[in-house]
Amino acid sequence: MKVRAILNPRAGLGARRALEDVRRGRPSWRDLEVKLTTGPGDAQRLAREAAAANADLVLAVGGDGTVNEAARGLLGSGVPLGIVPAGSGNGLARALGIPLSPARALRALEGALVRRIDVGTVNGVPFLNVAGVGFDALVGWAFHRAGRNGGRRGVLTYVRLSLALVRSYEPVPLRVEAGGEEFAARPFLVAFANGPQYGGGAVINPGARLDDGRFELVLYDDRPLLAILASAPRLFLGGIERVRGYRRIPTTRAVVTLERPLEHHRDGEPEPAALRLEIALLPRALPLLVPRTTAEDPSGPFTPPA
């Protein structure tokens, strides 16, 4: 099997160990080539080149940003993507039940099945798991800047930044068109969720299916600071959908028009400010390598066979 591994050496936790594990390879991956990224856009380019060179499988070794880029390079090629988590959030890997240890992830993927997942787009740019605008995007930008300036990455940094920013955060009024509804709102955040969770294990869209031909537009209303802080543990402990102010709308398309331009994110990666966000879906557009236990779990993130 011809395998190309695309590794971001700056992805964060576990990247160096992942490089060693991937180089060692698995018995069924005799023809394994490792390519290192050096900057934004490299993973997408390397994945596209791998598909053009008739690779049988591309492995994205890194965080959610590396996975997103590699997937963009493979869209339309039919070449499946495997995820070896080596970042700080690893949202999609967690949703797929892929072990966070690179060595264990490689073992799990060796006997994995191929499942096709839906791919969302924000203003035409793909995301796989969760995109959004509002407080989560603000924290994502701060997290990105902290990492770029040499700060520590990881869930604790994300929590620290969230606590620092939440006190002064002012939501922006916006207008939503989704699921046959149109309404004005001033939410704390709006998430466009194809998958169930952010990186770090924070579940924003419980019960999500990655292949059901729709995404969920999730709104969390602006509430008093203490109420927001009190509800935050629900993201990790379960039950966020029962929190007052939480609402989700299943849809295949949405438009969010903001009162003023605001930054957003795709799979945790910061995107520049925009006044209008158009979200759409590409049904089952990406073949993905999924651990067998997850692929066959009727309560997992894939639609059970009829």
What kind of feature is each model-predicted range?
Residues A5, A178-G179, A184, R209, ...:
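ATP/nucleoside-binding phosphotransfer catalytic cores, i.e., glycine-rich phosphate-binding loops
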Residues I6-L7, T37, L75-P80, A86-F188:
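Catalytic core of DAGKc-family lipid kinases
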Residues G147-L156, Y198-G201, P206-A227:
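Gly/Ser/Thr-rich active-site loops/lids in small-molecule metabolic enzymes
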Residues T66-S77:
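Short Gly/Thr/Asp-enriched flexible loops that form oxyanion-binding sites at enzyme active sites
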Residues P9, V61-G63, V84-A86, N194:
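Glycine-rich beta-strand-to-loop/alpha-helix junction loops that act as flexible
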Residues G132, D136, A191-I204, P270:
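Glycine-rich phosphate/pyrophosphate-binding beta-alpha loops
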